[in-house]
Regions:
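GST-like domain detector, emphasizing the conserved glutathione-binding G-site
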Residues: 1-121
Length: 121
């Protein structure tokens, strides 16, 4: 596995925090957003959305989106169970994570995107 990452971006940071809590190390590939590497044909072939993080699985499958990546990692490395161990715990974790994404992180991401020279036309 490899994690396509950018150290200063908030979403990849969430995955790195998750990995640290799990005590799992995965090789990282830096995608420099300031240099617009996320818009290169090579990266768009990996993730047509042009966003990080992206987790490349050993079979060549690519996962994007923090929650999908973290849920996969939680299933592959079940201890500690950060998404919970029961269906109720897992559903509550996903519910609150989605609320944070939809009501908090999206607004912050738009501000950062509009302030960043790497995203200007």
């Amino acid at each position: 596995m490899r994690l396509f990452d950018f150290g200063r971006a908030p979403n990849p940071r969430r995955v790195r925090i998750f990995l640290a809590e799990k005590q799992v190390e995965i090789p990282r590939v830096t995608v420099n957003l300031f240099r617009r590497e996320q818009l290169s044909p090579e990266f768009l072939a990996i993730n047509p959305g042009g966003t990080v993080p992206v987790l490349e699985l050993d079979d060549g499958t690519y996962l994007s989106e923090c929650l999908a990546i973290c849920q996969y990692l939680d299933a592959m490395h079940p201890e500690p169970a950060l998404f919970g161990t029961t269906p109720r715990q897992q559903a509550l974790t996903l519910m609150w994570a989605n609320i944070v994404d939809n009501e908090g992180m999206s607004a912050i991401a738009e501000v950062l995107r509009n302030l960043s020279p790497g995203f200007r036309d």
